[in-house]
Amino acid sequence: MDSLGTAATQFLFDLFKELNKTNDGNVFFSPVGISTAIGMIILGTRGATASELQKVLYTEQGTESSRIKSEEEEIEKREEIHHQLQMLLTEISKFSNDYDLIISNRLFGEKTYLFLQKYIDYVEKYYHASLEPVDFVNAADESRKKINSWVESQTNVKVKDLFPEGSLNSSTKLVLINTVYFKGLWDREFKKEHTKEEDFWLNKNLSKPVQMMALCSSFNFTFLEDLQAKIVGIPYKNNDISMFVLLPNDIDGLEKIMDKMSPEKLVEWTSPGHLEQRRVDLRLPRLQVEETYDLEPVLEAVGIHSAFSEHADYSGMSARSGLHAQNFLHRSFLVVTEEGVEATAGTGVGLKVSSAASCELVHCNHPFLFFIRHRESDSILFFGKFSSP
């Protein structure tokens, strides 16, 4: 992994740890999308606010070294961060006939604030994003509807009413939105006639019915002896993107995996040298995961404080004082079906798939971790915990 990939993976773990504390059920987010959104904020911040943001992304290596650097060196360093993120976005946003991957970022700012043209130019250059002035002071609800309409347009109308009525008001100065949408085709489709209703065990005493898909084929696979867990890599068409599932053997074994997991371990477990092609009898529930987070308290917990305070330094964004981020919303949406694409949910009576003796059984009928990784950039696009249908 390069330095950006390593930093992004560490940031992923920080985010997951905090999101998991406050979410007993499913967790699903895009570390790449959130890192990109923070990059846009860094573009407009200066001083301690910028340094704080860079530290959270593991791109700032200490306050002492920062103090002795010249202003020119600091500018050069900031530009390198944005250049790396720009290259990452360009790589993962390449057009494909086999999947849709849409990462959208937008800033909505109160129109009475004059935003610096240099900032507007840079946010367009590095992030293909724009800052749109809206009238929060006199037309907060109209502005809310405008923002929601933009979100719908970026997510194929799958994400509606991101901001509920009354969530924005005349005191709102800046809203930052990051939306991630993914839709892909499996390299090897599950057969619909093999899908059947099964119990998904939330714990040893409670279960919910799910539509369980089944496929016996060759996948990248490994068994983690010390954790009593299995990892299987499920490729999407053309193998640019794969979903990895980390499944504990025991119904209540997920906590042990999360306790032992680290950025280094995750890279090690899923490296080509650690995985091998095996015949796997894979049982995976149909998934529809949609999660929305106000990331302000989460980011504060991992070390970002001043960016959301009235003392934030956004002088790289506007010459006027008093500007600070008030809302940082993140919504991600994923559907997993037999084809891998969105489809109308339905209950099918299928045929049982018998496990051959040579097949490793990976039966995802209890809580597991999963993530979707882009091969060329070695970036984790999405990370999640599925614990409740």
UniProtKB/Swiss-Prot annotation:
The record marks S354, S355 as: Reactive bond. GO terms for biological process: negative regulation of keratinocyte apoptotic process. It holds the Pfam family Serpin. Its main location: cytoplasm. It is found in: Cytoplasm. GO terms for molecular function: cysteine-type endopeptidase inhibitor activity; protease binding; serine-type endopeptidase inhibitor activity. Keywords: Cytoplasm, Protease inhibitor, Serine protease inhibitor. CDD domains: serpinB13_headpin. GO terms for cellular component: cytosol; extracellular space; nuclear speck. Transmembrane segments: none annotated. May play a role in the proliferation or differentiation of keratinocytes. PANTHER family: SERINE PROTEASE INHIBITOR, SERPIN, SERPIN B13. Belongs to the serpin family. Ov-serpin subfamily. This is Serpin B13. It comes from Mus musculus.
